């Protein structure tokens, strides 16, 4: 009951942030009008909009395929349908919570309810998270090397978000590697930080959080050992997570071309969206609402006449439609599982 209330509050916060963000960006843009937005949608290429929708689904699909690869490799195979369901659960709750990994506990619980062991579930989710992080850093690096001008076009605020987002991703990778090779050092640093947070009254129960910390470090170490000896699995999961990142980035590119953007500037649009995704890790905001929008508009204002309309359409497909789709999948699964649960209780 407590978790349900907390999730409901996060959902309400997401809705409030979304409404506020839309109101701010539409009211502050001199070139935006609702009539113009509807005109843009009605004149958009159906083919490119279809491609954008397929790419949006790819964000859910490829994460699921990454989970399926790991589970199958570790001897606990899952179907494609269940893999997509676990992915949808992870994405849905990650969008509601401030953390990009906020959906993992919910996905872990669902996987365990379907018979996947806790160890395999945890490793599959963690491996996906690591490869997901490596993927965006790789894509961002390529964009910076190939088209550095995009970064230099952005204003100071957008650059700060992107730099913080990159630092957060690098720190996560460093922490993961250190857990593999120097577990004692990581534990000492984390213990110091935890004590400091407790003294600052940010955390209240040291022992409870310390136990969680030990569990996380143990999972990281198990996953790291797996990575060192299972190169084929590593490459497969990396590929699927790379495709997941590319899918969500390509939504913006397809929308850009679909509404009349010059195909010759497609990589510029790709770079702008890539940096928006990277910057989304800068602050603990549900769905990175406001941050992604700000960086997107900053990058696309040099590419299209009406960046707000393009942003609303692109973000609507890549984030909000995906959120609704994932929510529907979980609701359908809940309805299907409820009769079975009832029968089990009757038995």
Tell me what each language-model feature is.
Residues 1-39, 93-203, 285, 289-347:
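Transmembrane helix-loop-helix hairpins in multi-pass inner-membrane proteins
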Residues 8-9, 43-52, 225-239:
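Membrane-interface helix starts
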Residues 35-43, 216-228:
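A short amphipathic helical element positioned immediately N-terminal to and/or at the very start
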Residues 52-59, 90-97, 132, 240-244, ...:
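Alpha-helical transmembrane segments of multi-pass integral membrane proteins
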Residues 64-88, 255-272, 296:
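Membrane-embedded helical hairpins/re-entrant loop segments and their flanking transmembrane helices
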Residues 72, 84-115, 207-221:
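Extended non-transmembrane interhelical loops and adjacent amphipathic helices
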Residues 81-90, 267-278, 306-316:
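Alpha-helical transmembrane segments of multi-pass membrane proteins
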Residues 224-278:
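Transmembrane helical segments that form the transport core of multi-pass membrane transport proteins
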């Amino acid at each position: 009951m407590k978790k349900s209330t907390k999730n409901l509050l996060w959902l309400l916060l997401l809705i409030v942030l979304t409404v506020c963000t839309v109101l701010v960006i539409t009211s502050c843009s001199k070139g935006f009008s609702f009539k113009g937005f509807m005109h843009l949608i009605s004149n958009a290429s159906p083919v490119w909009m279809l491609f954008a929708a397929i790419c949006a689904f790819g964000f859910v699909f490829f994460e699921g395929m990454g989970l399926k690869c790991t589970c199958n490799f570790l001897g606990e195979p899952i179907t494609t349908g269940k893999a997509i369901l676990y992915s949808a659960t992870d994405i849905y709750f990650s969008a509601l919570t401030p953390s990009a990994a906020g959906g993992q506990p919910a996905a872990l619980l669902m996987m365990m309810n379907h018979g996947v062991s806790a160890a395999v579930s945890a490793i599959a989710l963690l491996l996906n998270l690591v490869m997901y992080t490596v993927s965006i850093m790789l894509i961002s690096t390529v964009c910076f090397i190939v088209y550095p001008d995009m970064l230099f076009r952005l204003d100071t605020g957008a650059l700060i978000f992107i730099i913080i987002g990159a630092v957060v991703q690098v720190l996560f990778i460093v922490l993961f590697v250190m857990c593999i090779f120097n577990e004692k050092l990581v534990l000492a640093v984390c213990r110091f930080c935890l004590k400091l947070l407790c003294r600052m009254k940010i955390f209240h129960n040291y022992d409870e959080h310390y136990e969680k910390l030990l569990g996380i470090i143990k999972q990281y170490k198990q996953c790291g050992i797996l990575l060192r000896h299972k190169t084929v699995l590593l490459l497969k999961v990396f590929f699927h997570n790379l495709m997941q990142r590319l899918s969500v980035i390509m939504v913006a590119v397809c929308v850009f071309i679909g509404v009349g953007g010059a195909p010759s500037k497609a990589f510029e649009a790709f770079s702008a969206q890539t940096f928006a995704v990277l910057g989304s890790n800068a602050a603990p905001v549900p769905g990175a609402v406001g941050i992604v929008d700000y960086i997107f508009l900053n990058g696309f204002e040099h590419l299209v006449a009406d960046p707000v309309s393009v942003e609303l359409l692109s973000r609507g497909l890549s984030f909000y439609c995906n959120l609704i789709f994932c929510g529907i999948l979980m609701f359908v699964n809940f309805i299907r599982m409820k009769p079975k649960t009832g029968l089990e209780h009757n038995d």
